[in-house]
Curated annotation (Swiss-Prot):
Residues 30-55, 220-244 are annotated as: Disordered. Its main location: plastid. This is ATP-dependent Clp protease ATP-binding subunit CLPT4, chloroplastic. The gene is CLPT4. Accessory protein regulating the assembly of the plastid Clp protease system. It is found in: Plastid, Chloroplast. The lineage of its organism: Eukaryota, Viridiplantae, Chlorophyta, core chlorophytes, Chlorophyceae. Residues 30-48 have a biased composition (Low complexity). Keywords: Chloroplast, Plastid, Transit peptide. Belongs to the ClpA/ClpB family.
Amino acid sequence: MQALQASRLTGQARPCSSSVVPRCSSLHVSRPISSGVSSSQELSSRSSAPATKSWRSSGRVITRATATAAPSELDDVGVSAAAESIIQYAINFARASETYEVHSWMVLMGILKYETCTAAKILKSLGLEDLYGAWNEVLWALNVCDGLQPRSFVTDIKFADRAFKVITAASDFAVWHGKDKMYSEDVLMALAAGGVLEDLFPDLNLSFERVRKAVEKESGRRYQLPDETEEAGPLKSEDDVSFL
């Protein structure tokens, strides 16, 4: 498949003239989440809650967080090497670009960067074959939304609300999938639940349900959401972390 055309993002990335990070709909994954989740159900306004020095959220209320390193534990699950590398990539990208704030799109760029992780393989199976081209499209979209506008130097890098909600939601998906660690496909599920993938690649139908089915096919086990009847099955594969 030819490189994806950047023009298809025109009008999808909602510009924000004064914001350092694009405000293209903030992700909110409610608990419990229904099997019929849609992007419109996941959207909420940015929170004004102060930053904390933890990746976890008190009382399951998601807040912005100081990002010093990828977490060794989030809520009740650990973090796989692949998921940690993806999140750390987003942190390093925010530092290198001098924005000092991680945006959800930067998390997606981490998936696109590590082409051998499970999430990247799933995206390819869903039609996003040119991962390098897609990475450049997301970078272009960040520029359009002023998401790479330099800020004054700060020692701490923070997560924007939407990015932090993606990571926290990913830990929930890991639990619902019966795993003791968050894997890259859980991060992908959280991005899909918030409509991040559909916003950036509207012509590929990367809806939550379609991504969910692809993840379940790859893993050999369905995601058990809180309001659904349990269906047991073996988990046949996890992330390939050979790129580390």
